[in-house]
């Protein structure tokens, strides 16, 4: 199985450190990049339009962030997705237990799951093995 690249889009710097260390410790992915909001991640995606190998395979996307939240990011991703030659899958990560967020996540075709914070090693193993 080829290891995949993963991006984490979340405004919590402590969570970013924890998930980064966990991913590195268990060696589940070939590379990890972190972004503090959807706008910065979207800009990075746009810069990589001509370089599919540098695009992420998986995005862990937090919903509630400043500048551009997770839902706004998903709307923008939907607009640029046809330009990618690579399939990018998204997992929503949330501390919210709101049913409407879970239901909304099901309306996006490239959202494969909804995970509660904190993301566990088992969650990451499952993601790495199914994508």
What are these regions (language model features)?
Residues 71-84:
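Short amphipathic alpha-helix used as the core "switch/output" element in two-component signaling
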Residues 72, 86-88, 96-113:
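Alpha4 helix (beta4-alpha4-beta5 surface) of REC/receiver domains from two-component response regulators
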Residues 117:
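A Lys-centered signature of the CheY-like receiver
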Residues 59, 113-114:
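Two-component signal transduction core modules
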Residues 65:
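Receiver (REC) domain active-site loop signature in two-component systems and cognate sites
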Residues 4-14, 19-23:
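Conserved acidic segment of CheY-like receiver
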């Amino acid at each position: 199985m080829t290891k995949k690249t993963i991006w984490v889009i979340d405004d919590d710097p402590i969570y970013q450190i924890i998930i980064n260390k966990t991913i590195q410790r268990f060696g589940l992915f070939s590379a990890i990049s972190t972004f503090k909001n959807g706008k910065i991640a979207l800009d990075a995606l746009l810069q990589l339009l001509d370089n599919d190998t540098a695009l992420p395979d998986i995005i862990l996307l937090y919903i509630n962030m400043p500048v551009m939240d997770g839902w706004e990011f998903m709307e923008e991703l939907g607009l640029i997705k046809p330009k990618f030659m690579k399939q990018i899958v998204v997992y929503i990560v949330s501390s919210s237990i709101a049913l409407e967020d879970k239901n909304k996540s099901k309306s996006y075709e490239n959202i494969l799951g909804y995970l509660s914070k904190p993301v566990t090693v088992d969650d990451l193993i499952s993601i790495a093995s199914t994508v």
